[in-house]
Amino acid sequence: MTSAQIHPVSLIGGGPGAWDLITVRGMRALQEAEVILTDHLGPAPQLDKLCDISAKELIDVSKLPYKKSITQDKINELLIEHAQAGRKVARLKGGDPFVFGRGFEEVQALAQASIPTTVIPGVTSAISVPAGLPLIHISKP
């Protein structure tokens, strides 16, 4: 397979929790994907509200303490394997791909395999969750 046949892997941050806080770009990448690797965090349980999942291969790569756990090396292998097969791959993560998300490790593994990535960050909870608290409060002039 030539590199022209390899699609960039989309690394998508799902935002701070609720399924409808994902970005429009993230939702579009999920709609275009043929294979989606998901965590147990973020919008993964409501994926069917973001795209038609009937023709997609969904791979649960959750890391749960004392339960099922996929190693990061195995996740990297799956991303590379599906991308090299010419499939459109999305990696959906809860929150932001790089804040405790090990996104850099995935980008690095893909780069070592000469597979391009597209990073679609999630909305940061500090500025997105309507908690009624200001992001910055200065009470003195």
Annotate each predicted stretch with a short phrase.
Residues K49, V129-P130:
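Short Asp/Glu-rich motifs
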Residues Q112-A113, A131-P134:
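Alpha-helix C-terminal capping segments
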Residues L133-P141:
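Residue-level detector of conserved catalytic or cofactor/ligand-binding positions
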Residues T124-S128:
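Short alpha-helices
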Residues M1-W19, V24-V123:
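Class I S-adenosyl-L-methionine
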